[in-house]
């Protein structure tokens, strides 16, 4: 009743009417409130699925409007923000009827429910059957430390010496990033003494001398004082993918943005 903003008596009348029409009890009444019967639980599952389908339909309808206008929802890892934000800003300037929603983080937004128009994802190629997946680029990663760390602890003498150093890692042990998985395989857990949930925080922690950690080529250019502790490995490379839902992929707005993004990204060194 509170969520619907109606009196609880109104909700009770609707429940009674629904039970009468279906000819079955949906709830057990007791002093503490209502408990769903087996039939009530079945109805809830169907209602939830129906609500999800309407949400999905609404998202697709919003995304299928003609022209480059309305919302453009783009999701990405936060580590791409420094290079992606200027592209989004310029695209918005060239399309003044557009509102950009740039959603960053590790969450996988559900494109099939219209939660985003374009997703940039890292790791293995997404395999959802209703998504259109295109290779974007591969991000080269570097294992580095700040001068303050090197002064205190020195530089690792090869892979075997990594166990004698302190590292910055991800707080999510299930991270799909290849360089984070590599670190978990090569370095004992007790040597990863600074954990983060945000890739930008990884850079800040490295610069602060909290330990050895991974940064991108772009970050290396921004912080030339950082020192590579070993040559970059191919297995650290993070492949990135452009992902769109099949129902929105051919819309004018999505196609215009994808074309614009690919042109701008051809000059990136990340």
Model segments located where?
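A short LG(V/I)-centered, amphipathic sequence patch enriched
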Residues: 19-36
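Acidic, Gly/Pro-rich loop/turn segments at junctions of secondary structure
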Residues: 103-196
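Short helix-loop hinge/linker segments at domain boundaries
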Residues: 31-34, 41, 52-73
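Conserved amphipathic alpha-helical core elements
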Residues: 18-19, 226
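Hydrophobic hinge/microswitch elements
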Residues: 187-228, 250
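Central regulatory/effector-binding core of bacterial HTH transcription factors
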Residues: 70-128
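Helix-turn-helix DNA-binding motif, specifically the short coil turn and the N-cap/start of the second
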Residues: 5-10, 14
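C-terminal effector-binding regulatory domain of bacterial HTH transcription factors
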Residues: 45, 97, 160, 217-225, ...
